[in-house]
Design a protein with these regions (language model features):
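Conserved beta-strand/loop scaffold segments within soluble protein domains that form the structured core
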Residues: 1-247, 261, 265, 269-292
């Protein structure tokens, strides 16, 4: 995705953020023309103690391709709250690469939500350069029909006292396929690292497929690291309970799916509520390409 974006993006949006005053920014990009290409490249530099809340909304339809590359450097004590809401309609495709470097005491919070693309691939790449930084990654992807949703994340700790919280959720239905690979690297220099990684998945169709691989590589000997993965269907006892209260089967299933998704979407910035992400992800609101 990176080389492709660099070869096609004629422009780059560069932002330098300084000062302790929080800044909020929303960027909306739409690719709708048949066989169109939308290359997006964004460069962020957050100086010491700077704070930015960035929401990116990506809309795609027709046989379009959206290519996103974001590169960010967080100075000491800087904070970046970053959301990517990707709403597509097949056969549109999305390729996204998010590369973030963190200095000590910085905080990076990434929340991603995607559905509807024929192919959606997101690649968060996080490097904690000097330790004592915090990273929080929350992802939600939905794949149905013949759609493929892929997330490959990579986090590396270069110094001591770093921390990571990662939760990735996926729903696969129809003949959709969801792929998650989360790599965490803890070299010897990264003592006292505290990292947790969890992949939770719902498989709603016999023809759907889920591949999940949380991955820890630990060399340091003084760490607290854990990972796990679950793949399940909707729980029959929960469905039975709702139906016993007079709720029909379809509505009961939708309620359980809403609850599954809501946990991940709670991490989105407050401004994201204008896009009604839960309703759009579950196709219960306005058309995906319609602006709020």
């Amino acid at each position: 995705p990176v080389q492709f974006n660099h070869a096609t993006a004629g422009r780059c949006l560069a932002l330098r953020v300084s000062g302790p005053e929080p800044i909020s920014l929303e960027l909306v990009s739409a690719a709708s023309q048949p066989e169109s290409l939308l290359p997006l490249r964004l460069l962020l530099l957050l100086e010491e103690q700077a704070e930015l809340e960035l929401s990116q909304v990506l809309l795609g339809s027709g046989s379009s391709l959206t290519s996103l590359v974001l590169e960010a450097h967080l100075g000491r004590g800087a904070r970046l709250r970053h959301a990517v809401i990707a709403l597509g309609e097949a056969p549109a495709c999305l390729l996204g690469h998010l590369a973030v470097e963190q200095e000590s005491e910085s905080r990076y919070q990434l929340s991603t939500a995607s559905r509807g693309w024929a192919l959606a691939r997101l690649e968060p790449r996080i490097s904690q350069l000097s330790g004592a930084a915090h990273t929080q990654l929350t992802g939600l992807q939905l794949a149905e029909e013949r759609q493929v949703a892929v997330t490959h994340s990579w986090v590396r700790f270069e110094g001591p006292d770093g921390s990571l919280e990662q939760l990735h959720k996926a729903i696969a239905d129809g003949q959709g396929r969801s792929v998650f690979n989360g790599a965490v690297r803890v070299p010897r220099a990264a003592q006292r690292t505290n990292a947790s990684q969890l992949s939770r998945n719902l498989l709603l169709s016999p023809q759907a497929r889920i591949d999940t691989k949380p991955e820890l590589e630990i060399v340091a000997d003084d760490v607290r690291c854990a990972h796990g993965a679950t793949v399940s269907r909707l729980q029959l006892d929960q469905l039975f309970y709702l139906q016993s209260r007079g709720i029909d089967a379809e509505l009961a299933a939708n309620l359980l799916k809403r609850g599954f998704c809501a946990e991940a979407l709670q991490q989105l910035p407050a401004a994201a509520a204008n896009w009604r992400p839960l309703e759009r992800l579950l196709r219960q609101g306005s058309p995906l390409g319609e602006l709020p």
